[in-house]
Amino acid sequence: MKLLSSICLIALAAPLFAEGPKVSAIVERARATAGTEAALNNLVTLQISGWIEPAESKMPSATILIISRKPCSQRLVVTVDDLVETTILQGDSGCIIRSNLSDEEKRSQIRTMTDEELKRVAFSTRQFFSFYGADFKRGERIEYEGIEQRRGVRCHKLLYSYPDGISTTRYFAINDDLLVSTITDKGVESVEVGEQIVAGIKFPKRVEYYQGQTMLHTMVVRDIKVNKPLKRGIFTIPTGQKTK
């Protein structure tokens, strides 16, 4: 029975890698640059705090706090001056809360996420734990798209795509397997800069975001906590929110 199950699993997984051996080898080497398989697979909770520096000086900066738990829970808090936007995802349900710290008498505005927002936030949450691996359970495919020059580096170009239309293109350096660039299906490019090791896993010191040749903003990572206890109810959807 175990043998039959294994054969079925291989049969299902095989089509998800275009040019299987080549793609799987690239992904395996790229994952090794982020940490050991044990360290990556044992990541269950992740807390990242820092701030966002806009490229244009006239735009205000923001503080950011991301709390995620495998497989699909996230709390994202972005604060700009007295305005706070909190995004909460818990499995198939999510909401967005907007608050004004300077007006304590004014009630927070809460709304349920749209289906598109829910899909995107769930995707971003899963990305925290995937470390370049394919999300087989949800039908993600990885296709090899050849060798390209990206940011002055010769790279393997891999296209990650889901059946629902979400896709990501990643560029991995040929010489050292490091991630050079990630581009979403919306055309936003992220480039990781610097490194810090936490619990045996490599994280960037900052992430730069671009649209084409134009820099949008930079996220500076101040602190990272791996597998630390989380506050009870941190992902609870406030009472009255619709659930799916």
Regions inferred by a protein language model and the residue ranges of each:
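Sec-dependent signal peptide recognition
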Residues: 1-9
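N-terminal mature ectodomain segment of secretory-pathway/periplasmic proteins
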Residues: 19, 25-103, 143-144, 162
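Flexible, processing/modification-adjacent segments and terminal tails
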Residues: 19-28, 32, 93-166, 230, ...
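Short, solvent-exposed secondary-structure boundary motifs
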Residues: 52-59, 75-80, 125-140, 159-163, ...
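Short amphipathic beta-strand/extended segments with alternating polar/hydrophobic composition
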Residues: 62-65, 86-91, 105-116, 171-172, ...
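Gly/Pro-enriched, hydrophobic low-complexity segments
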Residues: 83, 147-238
